[in-house]
């Protein structure tokens, strides 16, 4: 488990390129036949990837000591979106088939969660966010046909994109975790511009569906102290509540966003005008 401490905005603005990457970038999300796990002190979110290829993968009791529990989801809820080939997730003996861009919410208290791929040639890639939970909500599969989509932006401003809301109150009930998938239209490069902050939630972005020769310049920092982190395919970045979170790519791309905090109101944000950015 890779533990990332919280960081004050006054400290963050003093960091050079590698310092910013060390604090906020999750460089390797998927490793064959393993799980990756990054624990952030910011709202206690855990993020990572699970890619079963030749065997099943599960998060066992080895994380219990680090989390102060006897099993992974004893006091946590889990959200998973599959960006790879078809797979299965078995929760306490109940098997769910999770295809490409299907998702599964797993409620607090699930003791055994096992991940598998159906075809080793095209393995599943399960990207997950995990957050503290105060009660148990039912485990539920969500397909792309069931999400709450919103299309925003314009080709003229190069920010035409569709926001697919997987885990939001309109779709299912969670304790605090919200997740969704945003896909830019071909030829569009900007996400979340004009940008915003939200003091009541932190966020994690996971960029994917990118060519090897492409990158995204992920914008972060306070609106008057902006910085950037260069992102490549299948990398994630942690965004504290004091930071903007926006990006521009060399080509169109897709990203998964995950939020945890004190509410789940999607529009609870503090907008920042482009003219006010520095």
UniProtKB/Swiss-Prot annotation:
Catalysed reaction, written as an equation:
5-dehydro-4-deoxy-D-glucuronate = 3-deoxy-D-glycero-2,5-hexodiulosonate
Give the required cofactors: Zn(2+)
The record ties this protein, via CDD domains, to: cupin_KduI_C, cupin_KduI_N
Q: Which residues bind Zn(2+)?
A: 196, 198, 203, 245
Q: What class of enzyme is it?
A: isomerase
Cite the Pfam families for this sequence: KduI
Q: In which pathway does it act?
A: Glycan metabolism; pectin degradation; 2-dehydro-3-deoxy-D-gluconate from pectin: step 4/5
Work out whether the entry's keyword set contains Lipoprotein. no
Molecular-function annotations in GO: 4-deoxy-L-threo-5-hexosulose-uronate ketol-isomerase activity; zinc ion binding
Tell me where on the tree of life, at the top rank, the source sits: Bacteria
Q: Name one GO biological process term.
A: D-glucuronate catabolic process
Question: What InterPro entries does UniProt report for this protein, alphabetically?
Answer: KduI, KduI/IolB_isomerase, KduI_N, RmlC-like_jellyroll, RmlC_Cupin_sf
Instruction: Keywords in alphabetical order, please.
Output: Isomerase, Metal-binding, Zinc
- PANTHER family reported in the protein's UniProt record: 4-DEOXY-L-THREO-5-HEXOSULOSE-URONATE KETOL-ISOMERASE
Q: Which HAMAP family match?
A: KduI
Quaternary structure, from the entry: Homohexamer.
State the protein's purpose: Catalyzes the isomerization of 5-dehydro-4-deoxy-D-glucuronate to 3-deoxy-D-glycero-2,5-hexodiulosonate.
Entry similarity comment: Belongs to the KduI family.
- This chain belongs to which protein, by name? 4-deoxy-L-threo-5-hexosulose-uronate ketol-isomerase
């Amino acid at each position: 488990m890779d533990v990332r401490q919280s960081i004050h905005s006054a400290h963050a603005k003093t960091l050079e390129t590698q310092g910013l990457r060390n604090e906020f970038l999750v460089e390797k999300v998927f490793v064959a036949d393993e799980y990756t796990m990054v624990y952030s002190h910011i709202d206690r979110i855990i993020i990572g990837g699970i890619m079963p290829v030749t065997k099943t993968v599960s998060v066992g009791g080895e994380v219990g000591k680090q989390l102060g529990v006897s099993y992974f989801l004893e006091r946590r809820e889990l959200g998973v979106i599959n960006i790879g080939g078809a797979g299965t997730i078995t929760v306490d003996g109940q098997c769910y088939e999770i295809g490409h861009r299907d998702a599964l919410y797993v409620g607090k208290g699930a003791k055994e969660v096992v991940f598998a791929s159906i075809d080793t040639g095209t393995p599943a890639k399960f990207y997950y966010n995990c957050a503290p939970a105060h009660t148990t909500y039912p485990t539920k599969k969500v397909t792309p046909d069931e999400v709450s989509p919103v299309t925003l932006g314009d080709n003229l401003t190069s920010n035409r994109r569709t926001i697919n809301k997987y885990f939001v109150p309109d779709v299912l009930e969670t304790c605090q975790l919200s997740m969704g998938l945003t896909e830019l239209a071909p030829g569009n490069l900007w996400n979340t511009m004009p940008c915003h902050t939200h003091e009541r939630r932190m966020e994690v972005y996971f960029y994917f569906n990118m060519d090897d020769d492409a990158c995204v310049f992920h914008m972060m920092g306070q609106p008057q102290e902006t910085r950037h982190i260069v992102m490549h395919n299948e990398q994630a970045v942690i965004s504290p509540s004091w930071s903007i979170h926006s990006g521009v790519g060399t080509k169109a791309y897709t990203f998964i966003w995950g939020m945890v905090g004190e509410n789940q109101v999607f529009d609870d944000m503090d907008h920042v005008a482009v003219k006010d950015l520095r």
